[in-house]
Every structure is written in C-alpha cells, then in structure tokens.
Amino acid sequence: MPLHNLTRFPRLEFIGAPTPLEYLPRFSDYLGREIFIKRDDVTPMAMGGNKLRKLEFLAADALREGADTLITAGAIQSNHVRQTAAVAAKLGLHCVALLENPIGTTAENYLTNGNRLLLDLFNTQIEMCDALTDPNAQLEVLATRVEAQGFRPYVIPVGGSNALGALGYVESALEIAQQCEGAVNISSVVVASGSAGTHAGLAVGLEHLMPESELIGVTVSRSVADQLPKVVNLQQAIAKELELTASAEILLWDDYFAPGYGVPNDEGMEAVKLLARLEGILLDPVYTGKAMAGLIDGISQKRFKDEGPILFIHTGGAPALFAYHPHV
C-alpha cells in the first residue's frame, strides 16, 4: 500500500462513511458519454462540501497544539470559511474569519445571504478587509492580535490548502479507487482547481492508485501560468510528507473562469441548470458550475485523452446559490 504513511497523521472523523460515487444516467445520455460523480457535496456538516476532508486533519492538528480558536480567510461567500466555522462550533472552539468582497458588489443578497448567513448562525467573529492580497501574512497579523486578547489561535490557510489539509484528498483518492475497483475504469477525472489543495491531493493519490486516469483541474480564479506553480508546489509538499514520489503531470484548463473569481458566467450557469434539471443535483456558480462547464465543453471539443468514463468531483458549494440570485 503506497499510501500507508497517511495513518501517521492525527485525524478527526467528521465524515465517517465514504461519500457516494454515482452514475448519472440522464446526464450521460445528454452528453453521449458515461459520467460519474463523487458526491463530496453531501459530507455531513453545514450543508456539505470538500473542505471537511481537509479539516479532519487541520482541526486534529489544532487540538494537538492546544488551540481554542480557529482563524481562516476567504471571500464573503467562502465555502471553506463556512465549513471551518461549523467545525469550530462542533469542537467548542472560537472562530475568527477574515473576509473580502472579491467582486466588489453592494448587493445585499451577496453580502448577507448564503454562506455569510450561516457564519452568523455559527457565531463566527467576522473581520473584513479590502482585499486578501497576501492572505498568509494577513492571517498572521490577525492571529497575533487574537493571541494578545488571550486566545490560543490556530491559523488555517485559505481553502485549507496546505500539505496537511491536502492529505484529505489523498485519502479521497483512496476512497475513489476502492469504489471504482471492479465496477468502472475511469478514464478522466475533473475537479475545480482554486486554492489547489483538493487538486494536488488528488494528483498525488491518483498517481499511485489509478495511474491510467488523467486528472484535469478546471481553474476558477487563475490562468494556467499562475495556477500551475501553486498546484505543483503543493503536490511536491504532500509527497514529501508521505515520503512518496510525485511525478504526474499537472493538467489545467483555464478557459472557463472568466470574467473572474466569484463572478458567474453563462457557461457555468447553464451547467448548474443542466445538472439540476437532468439529475436533481445542485452545483454552484463559483466552483463546480465552471468546472462542469469545462467537462461539457471538453467532451464537445474532444479535449479528453479518450472517450472513456469521466468522474466529476463534486466539491459542494450549493449554499452560494442563494447569494447569487437573480443570476440563478
């Protein structure tokens, strides 16, 4: 077992049983290709999502260090911040969130609904900033201030995307390989690529467990030139933690995130509506809608390595739908 070193790292069990891996019959008929979906949108806490896999490792480390406060950062409609706040509530910890308004909107629905509404329910302390220009440095400044107030803070990076958090998606690759074994030979895997931890963790895990499958990251905020070093650096950091080699090429498509992070586009919204109407599954306008737009266009443009089955990693995000009305 090449991933045996995973068990060396403390981990809290938030998810329990594997999330479903499902065939999408009506969507497959529509696209003329076998499409499967990994349902990380239905993880148990706070309306689900992929960040819970990372938080199993990060929160365990926070408790090991004796922290009483989790500090993290993201957009006003950040799924990661919402899930971090929920984990803090479950563990009896304080949570401080440094938020930015990445789309510069004054729309009350965006500023108060969706994920932002849930932060208040979790009793999160909100700190606003003009922009997360250097989030790691900004989080350290905030942590110093919180510590001076008598708390013991633990900083979780944007998206939970460091080598420790990304182990959650090495673990996910193991889960996927076990679910596919003897059932389906996945040719291609598609995932949204943002803060890069999910993408990099899958890259390390799938290289060792499903080496014949190509992994495509559809960017949601950056060009390939800007995103590639982020994914590669995390890929190598994860491999170092696990004492593995990681030589798989990182594949990125950056044609689907315009006009920018957090701003809906027509292709992404059409993908959201399509999956809702054909399969009753909810995507979101920021991450999974744009990633699914890439999958759909990738089939029509013959961008995949062959015509075999495709697995879409559903990372969650549906709470943001409420904040993006009337785009939806």
From Swiss-Prot:
Keywords: Lyase, Pyridoxal phosphate. The modification N6-(pyridoxal phosphate)lysine is found at residue 51. Its EC number is 4.4.1.15. InterPro entries: ACCD_DCysDesulf (IPR027278), D-Cys_desShydrase (IPR005966), D_Cys_desulphydr_bac (IPR023702), TrpB-like_PALP (IPR001926), TrpB-like_PALP_sf (IPR036052). GO terms for biological process: D-amino acid metabolic process. Its cofactor is pyridoxal 5'-phosphate. It comes from the Bacteria. One of its GO terms (molecular function) is D-cysteine desulfhydrase activity. Pfam families: PALP. The keyword Lyase applies. It catalyses: D-cysteine + H2O = hydrogen sulfide + pyruvate + NH4(+) + H(+). Belongs to the ACC deaminase/D-cysteine desulfhydrase family. Homodimer. Catalyzes the alpha,beta-elimination reaction of D-cysteine and of several D-cysteine derivatives. It could be a defense mechanism against D-cysteine. This is D-cysteine desulfhydrase. It comes from Escherichia coli O6:H1 (strain CFT073 / ATCC 700928 / UPEC). The gene is dcyD.
